[in-house]
Protein backbone atom coordinates (compact mmCIF):
# COMPACT_ATOMS: atom_id res chain seq x y z
CA UNK A 1 0.00 0.00 0.00
CA UNK A 2 1.40 3.37 -0.94
CA UNK A 3 1.23 6.54 1.09
CA UNK A 4 -0.30 8.40 -1.81
CA UNK A 5 -4.12 8.09 -1.91
CA UNK A 6 -5.35 6.69 -5.19
CA UNK A 7 -1.79 5.78 -6.16
CA UNK A 8 -1.66 8.85 -8.41
CA UNK A 9 1.66 10.56 -8.67
CA UNK A 10 1.31 14.29 -9.00
CA UNK A 11 4.16 16.73 -9.08
CA UNK A 12 3.75 19.56 -6.64
CA UNK A 13 4.22 22.89 -8.31
CA UNK A 14 5.36 25.75 -6.11
CA UNK A 15 3.17 28.82 -5.98
CA UNK A 16 4.53 32.35 -5.68
CA UNK A 17 3.88 34.21 -2.43
CA UNK A 18 0.76 36.32 -2.22
CA UNK A 19 1.04 40.01 -2.96
CA UNK A 20 2.14 41.78 0.19
CA UNK A 21 4.38 39.00 1.48
CA UNK A 22 8.09 39.43 0.99
CA UNK A 23 11.37 38.11 2.43
CA UNK A 24 12.50 39.16 5.87
CA UNK A 25 15.40 41.58 6.11
CA UNK A 26 17.82 39.13 7.76
CA UNK A 27 20.84 41.32 6.98
CA UNK A 28 19.26 44.43 8.51
CA UNK A 29 19.77 46.42 5.32
CA UNK A 30 16.63 48.51 5.84
CA UNK A 31 16.40 48.49 9.64
CA UNK A 32 17.20 52.21 10.01
CA UNK A 33 14.39 53.20 7.61
CA UNK A 34 11.99 50.82 9.34
CA UNK A 35 12.79 52.25 12.78
CA UNK A 36 12.33 55.84 11.54
CA UNK A 37 8.90 54.90 10.19
CA UNK A 38 7.85 53.06 13.36
CA UNK A 39 9.01 55.96 15.56
CA UNK A 40 7.01 58.37 13.40
CA UNK A 41 3.91 56.18 13.75
CA UNK A 42 4.40 56.15 17.50
CA UNK A 43 4.69 59.96 17.62
CA UNK A 44 1.48 60.52 15.65
CA UNK A 45 -0.30 57.75 17.57
CA UNK A 46 -0.93 55.66 14.48
CA UNK A 47 -2.64 58.39 12.46
CA UNK A 48 -2.13 58.59 8.72
CA UNK A 49 0.39 61.48 8.76
CA UNK A 50 1.98 62.62 5.47
CA UNK A 51 5.47 62.72 6.97
CA UNK A 52 5.10 59.09 8.10
CA UNK A 53 3.94 58.11 4.61
CA UNK A 54 7.14 59.64 3.25
CA UNK A 55 9.15 57.50 5.70
CA UNK A 56 7.15 54.43 4.67
CA UNK A 57 8.02 55.25 1.08
CA UNK A 58 11.73 55.48 1.97
CA UNK A 59 11.50 52.10 3.72
CA UNK A 60 9.81 50.43 0.75
CA UNK A 61 12.32 52.03 -1.63
CA UNK A 62 15.14 50.53 0.45
CA UNK A 63 13.48 47.11 0.27
CA UNK A 64 13.11 47.42 -3.51
CA UNK A 65 16.72 48.60 -3.90
CA UNK A 66 17.98 45.58 -1.93
CA UNK A 67 15.68 43.19 -3.84
CA UNK A 68 13.69 42.32 -0.73
CA UNK A 69 10.50 43.03 -2.66
CA UNK A 70 9.52 43.53 -6.28
CA UNK A 71 9.51 47.03 -7.73
CA UNK A 72 6.06 48.54 -8.03
CA UNK A 73 4.54 51.93 -8.72
CA UNK A 74 3.97 54.11 -5.67
CA UNK A 75 0.29 54.51 -6.55
CA UNK A 76 -0.14 50.72 -6.36
CA UNK A 77 1.37 50.80 -2.86
CA UNK A 78 -0.94 53.60 -1.73
CA UNK A 79 1.85 56.17 -1.58
CA UNK A 80 2.23 59.51 -3.38
CA UNK A 81 4.75 60.11 -6.13
CA UNK A 82 7.88 62.22 -5.49
CA UNK A 83 6.38 65.70 -5.94
CA UNK A 84 3.24 65.04 -3.88
CA UNK A 85 5.23 63.33 -1.11
CA UNK A 86 7.66 66.22 -0.72
CA UNK A 87 4.85 68.81 -0.71
CA UNK A 88 2.86 66.87 1.89
CA UNK A 89 5.87 66.38 4.16
CA UNK A 90 6.86 70.05 4.05
CA UNK A 91 3.27 71.16 4.76
CA UNK A 92 2.97 68.71 7.65
CA UNK A 93 6.28 69.74 9.22
CA UNK A 94 5.11 73.38 9.25
CA UNK A 95 2.10 72.45 11.41
CA UNK A 96 2.51 72.39 15.21
CA UNK A 97 2.17 68.91 16.77
CA UNK A 98 -1.18 67.94 18.28
CA UNK A 99 -1.51 67.55 22.01
From Swiss-Prot:
Compositionally skewed regions (Low complexity) per UniProt: 87-99
Localisation: Cytoplasm; Mitochondrion intermembrane space
Chain residue ranges for the region called Disordered: 1-26, 77-99
Keywords: Cytoplasm, Disulfide bond, Mitochondrion
S-S bonds: 30-62, 40-52
Keyword Cytoplasm on entry: yes
Keyword presence, Hydrolase: no
Record-level GO cellular component terms: mitochondrial intermembrane space
Listed Polar residues bias regions: 1-13
Highest taxon, organism lineage: Eukaryota
Biased composition (Basic and acidic residues): 77-86
Entry's Gene Ontology BP terms: mitochondrial cytochrome c oxidase assembly
Ranges of residues in domain CHCH: 27-70
Motif position, Cx9C motif 1: 30-40
InterPro entries: COX19
Motif, Cx9C motif 2: chain positions: 52-62
Function field: Required for the assembly of mitochondrial cytochrome c oxidase.
Family: Belongs to the COX19 family.
PANTHER family: CYTOCHROME C OXIDASE ASSEMBLY PROTEIN COX19
Protein name as annotated: Cytochrome c oxidase assembly protein COX19
Amino acid sequence: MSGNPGSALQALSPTPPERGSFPLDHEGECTAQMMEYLNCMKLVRGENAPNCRLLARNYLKCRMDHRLMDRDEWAHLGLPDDKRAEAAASADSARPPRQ
